[in-house]
From Swiss-Prot:
It is an enzyme of class 3 (hydrolase). It is found in: Cytoplasm. The lineage of its organism: Bacteria, Bacillati, Cyanobacteriota, Cyanophyceae, Nostocales. This is Histidine biosynthesis bifunctional protein HisIE. It comes from Nostoc sp. (strain PCC 7120 / SAG 25.82 / UTEX 2576). Its main location: cytoplasm. Pfam families: PRA-CH, PRA-PH. The gene is hisI. In the N-terminal section; belongs to the PRA-CH family. In the C-terminal section; belongs to the PRA-PH family.
């Protein structure tokens, strides 16, 4: 089944109604459909948009080579399309994808938007995902001064004990109806839960997918 076949009739992208520029092109911003990280920007024309809809993977138009290009066709880092939105003027596309290999940029970075004034930084995206990346780094490169590294060293016993303690503190904060305390304790609980995920080699995106399923 193609991507377009999975859409209800009222949600099919009106390819001919998109406002293309004088070159017949429309900008397509691509983002991770789970955490919202902006991955790249490229150009589509009518034909590449239709190919994207038909195949369920992103196809773009190369202005320099004057030809279609299938994202990841050579590297294997394809993009599985999950949604396509167009703006209020119908002259820009927002494409939500599952990025295979978690690499969208030809430099090997996850996102093409990884530089600010020449300095490489983490791409803008979901805060939980960024915190999880830091936690995984502490797991893979432990240091004596890192609290997170000490949790990993203690294994399940230490990690699960902390989750139990933080869960109880969330309950108490809610019982006291203390909004600031609730926010702080839930943050602590989320953090230690992320440590448990990393300890058991469960990617946070697996949790995002479960949450997507539960909201339907």
């Amino acid at each position: 089944m193609s991507f377009i076949d999975s859409l209800s009739p009222q949600n099919v992208i009106p390819v001919e109604e998109i406002r293309y520029d004088e070159r017949g092109l429309v900008p397509a911003i691509v983002q991770d459909y789970l955490d919202g990280t902006v991955l790249m920007m490229a150009w589509m024309n009518r034909e590449s948009l239709q190919k994207t809809l038909d195949t369920g993977e992103t196809w773009f138009w190369s202005r320099s080579r004057q030809e279609f290009w299938h994202k990841g066709g050579t590297s294997g880092h394809t993009q599985k399309v999950q949604s396509i939105r167009y703006d209020c003027d119908s002259d820009a596309l927002l494409v939500g994808v599952e990025q295979i290999g978690d690499i969208a940029c030809h430099t090997g970075e996850r996102s093409c938007f990884h530089q600010v004034e020449g300095k490489i930084v983490a791409p803008p995206g979901d805060t939980l995902s960024q915190v999880f990346q830091v936690i995984c780094d502490r797991r893979n490169h432990p240091t004596e001064s890192s609290y997170t590294s000490k949790l990993f060293a203690g294994g399940d016993n230490k990690i699960l004990k902390k989750i139990g303690e933080e869960s109880a503190e969330v309950v108490m904060a809610c019982k006291d109806d203390d909004q600031e305390a609730i926010a702080g304790e839930v943050a602590d609980l989320l953090y230690h839960t992320l440590v448990a995920l990393a300890h058991h080699q469960v990617d946070i995106k697996a949790v995002y997918r479960k949450l997507q399923e539960r909201r339907r």
